Amino acid sequence: MIQGTYYKEWSTVLGREMEFKVYGHAGVPVLALPARGGRFYDWENNGMPDAIAQLLNEGKVQLFCADAMDGEGLLNGDLPQRRRAELQEKYFVYLTAELAPRILTLNNAKKGTRIWTAGVDLGAYHAVHCRLRRPTLFAGAVGMGGIYDLTRFWGTDSDDMVLRCAPLAYLQENGIANKPALAKAEENLSLIHISEPTRLGMI
């Protein structure tokens, strides 16, 4: 059985500790996101590290299994739509502005290295969402059984922050479907409480 290295580190964006586990010692960095209601250890419990043991042992791939917080935001029906979208955006910023740089450090990545993302169910949504909004940071995404239409969870995508989190709302075949609305959403950074907002980048 492949043994991973466990980490529990403080997230300034989320104001809490977040857990993740790393498998392998080198290779292409892959950020793995859990399914709906899942945790970082689900990938190990379902045998994924063992399934790619050869790639991990040969230093071709390094797997980083992140934790999720869907139950607190996206799936929390007790919160209003806007607040759920705000929490989802904070999680996105955690993945892209905090965890991704940490992954590249642990990977001893060369300058310019980009991360791959992978996920199942809502994890696929997070994986693809990260790739679409931060293509300079993520090389590609593998979404398995993904849920990309978030209206089933929080209704229409009329709110600017909701739009910012919904791939089917902000993209069409040839690019961004509603550029003015998305531009407005990207300007709305006051809800993300980090000391260096410029680190977030823009879509």
Where on the chain are the PLM-derived regions?
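Non-catalytic cap/lid and distal C-terminal segments of serine-dependent acyl enzymes
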Residues: M1-L191, S195, R199
